[in-house]
Amino acid sequence: MEYFDMRKMSVNLWRNAAGETREICTFPPAKRDFYWRASITSIAANGEFSLFPGMERIVTLLEGGEMFLESADRFNHTLKPLQPFAFAADQVVKAKLTAGQMSMDFNIMTRLDVCKAKVRIAERTFTTFGSRGGVVFVINGAWQLGDKLLTTDQGACWFDGRHTLRLLQPQGKLLFSEINWLAGHSPDQVQ
């Protein structure tokens, strides 16, 4: 289990100066050719998403104005707060900020031939489904994960097992993504 606080994470500025990325985790760790990766991005200007052949991307707007996503002949979609949207990361997707407002997004990418991610929003205590990896990010409230207290802009990632996240207040929201491995694949096979 690895814990993080978004306010203390390293920030990587984009080459085109249109945004920045805070990488949460990758699997396998510290590998350029990852099977899955979670990050938080801030987008300050209209532009195109980076291409990642063979990957699926799920984007969830955390804060800021809505964002219009367009992929020629494939889709037009308005990204609304806390509504995950998945698309192939090997297609050109243009992002247009509405009302010029900067957005902050949670991104998870998975290699299509190896694993699949599912992103959800939780508002009550729950136990993960025994996936082989995942990420949680606290939107608001106080949550207990094992012996660790997580509050707004904090989270954790793991590479194995079931975990219970207990909401400690009457209200709270938590984004979580679980990674499930396709038949014939397992994190145990990765060196």
UniProtKB/Swiss-Prot annotation:
Disulfide bonds: none annotated. It holds the Pfam family HutD. Transmembrane segments: none annotated. InterPro entries: RmlC-like_jellyroll, RmlC_Cupin_sf, Uncharacterised_HutD/Ves, Uncharacterised_Ves. PANTHER family: PROTEIN VES. HAMAP family: Ves (MF_01591). Belongs to the Ves family. This is Protein Ves. The gene is ves.
